[in-house]
Swiss-Prot record:
Gene Ontology terms for molecular function: 4 iron, 4 sulfur cluster binding; 4-hydroxy-3-methylbut-2-enyl diphosphate reductase activity; metal ion binding
The protein, known as: 4-hydroxy-3-methylbut-2-enyl diphosphate reductase
Obligatory cofactor(s): [4Fe-4S] cluster
E.C. number(s) listed in UniProt: 1.17.7.4
Phylogenetic lineage: Bacteria, Pseudomonadati, Thermodesulfobacteriota, Desulfuromonadia, Geobacterales
Catalytic reactions of this protein: isopentenyl diphosphate + 2 oxidized [2Fe-2S]-[ferredoxin] + H2O = (2E)-4-hydroxy-3-methylbut-2-enyl diphosphate + 2 reduced [2Fe-2S]-[ferredoxin] + 2 H(+); dimethylallyl diphosphate + 2 oxidized [2Fe-2S]-[ferredoxin] + H2O = (2E)-4-hydroxy-3-methylbut-2-enyl diphosphate + 2 reduced [2Fe-2S]-[ferredoxin] + 2 H(+)
GO biological process: dimethylallyl diphosphate biosynthetic process; isopentenyl diphosphate biosynthetic process, methylerythritol 4-phosphate pathway; terpenoid biosynthetic process
Binding-site residues, isopentenyl diphosphate: H40, H72, H122, S216, N218, S260
Free-text cofactor note: Binds 1 [4Fe-4S] cluster per subunit.
Binding residues annotated for dimethylallyl diphosphate, in chain numbering: H40, H72, H122, S216, N218, S260
Organism this protein belongs to: Geotalea daltonii (strain DSM 22248 / JCM 15807 / FRC-32)
């Protein structure tokens, strides 16, 4: 059984930067916390906890110490509260997320109604929305955007893990909703590249394994685009979840991983699949 690993599997720039900031802070000791999980990887969060860095839902209970802003960013009021309390702030917000926050703030201040394309329950989107000073709407698809009310000036940004195709559908729906529309490119390039690579790989293999946190938006999207092409797509968080039955009759297996998946987990999955392949060949 041949195994093909996607070239872009694993940490993206923003996640690599965030984890580096967090682990460096953990190594220095002291009262250090992250505002929410630093990234959507339970294994990384657990490692940080073992080093004394725990994730907090908010800064309400903090009076001193260091707070690390997660890669998904934070709501503006949480940041203001951290500043008011004079906490040491380490901002690990992904630069692409930061750009989306700034666009929303500027659009709102310029009189635009803002449309954010993404998952309303995702912390990144909740943070982005908090920078709006006027009307702001969150839509997950073009179908939802069709239901938006008429507006004057519209500004559109997207959650960084969205697909360009979904963004286009929303923009098309918004074109008839207002007299002026401004669209900003806030989708992470790494996200787009990984999704295209996953599609290509899925078309070349008999089975796909997508590695990453079940709460990771970009990993779930990788699994979705892969499954559209290769129905035998399996989303796992760790090697122990692999089922040898998945590989019955499989000659080529493709592997990709979300932007928040650590290399050591990818290596463990590779090793386990190689072991399954050896057992099949006996």
């Amino acid at each position: 059984m041949k195994i093909i690993l996607a070239k872009q599997a694993g940490f993206c720039f923003g996640v690599k930067r965030a984890t580096q900031i967090a682990f460096e802070a953990a190594g220095k000791g002291g009262k250090t916390f992250t505002l929410g999980p630093i990234i959507h990887s339970p294994q990384v969060v657990q490692k940080l906890e073992e080093m004394g860095v725990k994730a907090l839902e908010n800064v309400a209970g903090m009076d001193e110490g260091t707070i690390i802003i997660r890669s998904h960013g934070a709501a503006s009021d949480e940041l203001e509260e951290a500043v008011r309390k004079q906490l040491d702030i380490l901002d690990a917000t992904c630069p692409f997320v930061k750009k989306a926050q700034e666009h929303v703030k500027n659009l709102s201040n310029s009189g635009y109604d803002v449309v954010v394309v993404g998952d309303a329950d995702h912390p990144e989107v909740q943070g982005i929305v908090s920078y709006a000073t006027g009307k702001v709407y969150v839509v997950a698809s073009g179908e939802e955007a069709v239901k938006l009310p008429k507006m004057g000036k519209i500004g559109v940004v997207a959650q960084t893990t969205q697909s360009f195709e979904n963004l286009r559908h929303v923009v098309d729906a918004c074109l008839v909703k207002g007299g002026e529309i401004r669209v900003f490119h806030t989708i992470c390039d790494a996200t787009a590249v990984r999704q295209e690579e996953a599609k290509k790989l899925a078309s070349q293999v008999d089975c796909m394994v997508v590695i990453g946190g079940y709460n990771s938006a970009n990993t779930k999207r990788l699994a979705e685009v892969s499954a559209e092409i290769q129905p035998r797509t399996h989303h796992i968080e760790m090697a122990q979840q692999l089922d040898p039955a998945w590989f019955e009759g499989v000659k080529i297996v493709g592997i990709t991983a979300g932007a928040s998946t650590p290399k050591w987990i990818i290596d463990e999955v590779l090793e386990q699949i190689e072991s399954i392949a050896k057992d099949k060949n006996r």
